[in-house]
């Protein structure tokens, strides 16, 4: 089989990444767990788990089909081995898949969702439902691709989960019903909606830091558990299609059944961006690698926002730029598009309101952390600190004034004082 490294592609100008033709980006376990919980809260545990599994199956099917074609994996054995290798390399843990075209079983060890949930919450809480919807969908997709079956032909159910204090994660696979393919959200779909990038403030500095961080990320690999642990978090290379289907279908579901609750769901989706910036960006800013490359954070607002924009670019979130910055008053972030934009346009058409939930929440977190975290004291960015920071509400608010998904020339989010 061919070299997997050659299956990575990046739009350097726009800071968007692809693997096997599928849009990908880096996210941490705090974001992953928060988003999954938001979906379950919005839809209910049963329907939320179904959506999470189906979104994973769909996005993983596209990934694995692209990779199998790219590296020349032709037989079921080769394709199952490829799926197991890719899953671990992306930081999701290890899968042992034993299937035929009619179904089978799989066993997971150190699965990203179940393991990180146990690490974060397991000492205090026993989970009542399985946590690994993503792994379940991935196993189903791996089986479909291995045997050349159409999407939907295999269903997977997690029958045991370490987050429920079982000894291992186990999955049962059985025949399903093929589903109608949806519009592809791939390299071609992304290219079709690209907008020219525009230089922002401190552009050269942001880009220099982003390139340095990209070089560093290129040296990071999964450990023997199939996990990537760094910057105080578990990091995954993840599928943008998974995140986007969860977010936008949850909003659509609530809008149809309980429209008055849409603002609540949208606020939680924005908070997922806030959670990511607090834990992942904060962990990077406090890391020895960052200190060696950029210098330890000092609490300088301008330097903080410059660093955060560089991190966003390196992680594959898009070409985030600073259009305006007045410390203690106002921040304007812009991007030609984000990883959310192509999906919304392909699957939901033009948006009627700001749809870049992650960009909105992240922008708020940029200013919250810049103004409220004592960086010189090298704080521990724990859940307790996060709760204490936001216990009395946010000091900053976001308004998305422009959105490529609405037909505008760029995405723009304005962050101002909330109180």
Give the role of each language-model region.
Residues 1-134, 148-358, 362, 372-419:
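N-terminal accessory segment detector
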């Amino acid at each position: 089989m061919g070299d997997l490294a050659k299956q990575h592609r990046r739009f350097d100008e726009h800071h968007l990444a692809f693997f096997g033709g599928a849009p990908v980006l880096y996210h941490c376990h705090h974001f992953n767990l928060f988003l999954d919980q938001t979906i379950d809260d919005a839809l209910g545990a049963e329907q939320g788990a179904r959506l999470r599994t189906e979104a994973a199956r769909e996005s993983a099917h596209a990934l694995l089909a692209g990779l199998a074609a790219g590296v020349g994996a032709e037989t079921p054995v080769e394709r199952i081995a490829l799926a197991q290798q890719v899953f671990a390399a992306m930081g999701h843990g290890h899968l042992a898949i034993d299937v035929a075209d009619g179904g089978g079983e799989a066993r997971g060890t150190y699965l990203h969702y179940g393991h990180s949930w146990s690490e974060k919450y397991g000492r205090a809480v026993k989970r009542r439902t399985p946590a690994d919807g993503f792994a379940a969908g991935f196993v189903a997709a791996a089986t479909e691709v291995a045997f050349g079956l159409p999407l939907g032909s295999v269903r997977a159910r997690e029958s045991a989960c370490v987050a429920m204090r079982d000894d291992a994660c186990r999955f049962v696979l059985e025949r399903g019903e093929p589903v109608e393919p949806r519009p592809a959200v791939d390299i071609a779909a992304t290219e079709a909606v690209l907008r020219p990038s525009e230089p922002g403030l401190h552009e050269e500095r942001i880009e220099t830091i982003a390139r340095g961080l990209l070089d560093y990320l290129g040296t990071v690999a999964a450990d023997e558990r199939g996990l990537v642990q760094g910057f105080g978090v578990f990091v995954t290379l993840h599928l943008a299609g998974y995140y986007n289907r969860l977010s936008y279908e949850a909003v659509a579901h609530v809008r149809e059944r309980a429209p008055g609750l849409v603002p609540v769901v949208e606020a939680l989706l924005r908070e997922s961006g806030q959670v990511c910036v607090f834990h992942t960006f904060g962990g990077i800013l406090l890391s020895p690698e960052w200190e060696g490359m950029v210098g330890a954070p000092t609490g300088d607002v301008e330097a903080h926002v410059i660093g955060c924009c560089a991190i966003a670019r390196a992680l594959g979130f898009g070409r985030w730029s600073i259009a305006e910055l007045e410390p203690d008053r106002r921040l304007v972030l812009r991007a030609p598009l984000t990883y959310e934009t192509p999906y919304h346009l392909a699957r939901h058409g033009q948006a009627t309101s700001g749809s870049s939930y992650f960009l909105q929440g992240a922008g708020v977190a940029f200013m919250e952390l810049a103004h409220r975290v004592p960086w010189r004291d090298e704080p521990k960015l724990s859940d307790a600190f996060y709760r204490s920071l936001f216990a009395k509400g946010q000091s900053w608010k976001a308004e998305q004034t422009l959105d490529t998904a609405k037909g505008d020339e760029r995405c723009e989010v304005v962050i101002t004082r909330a109180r």
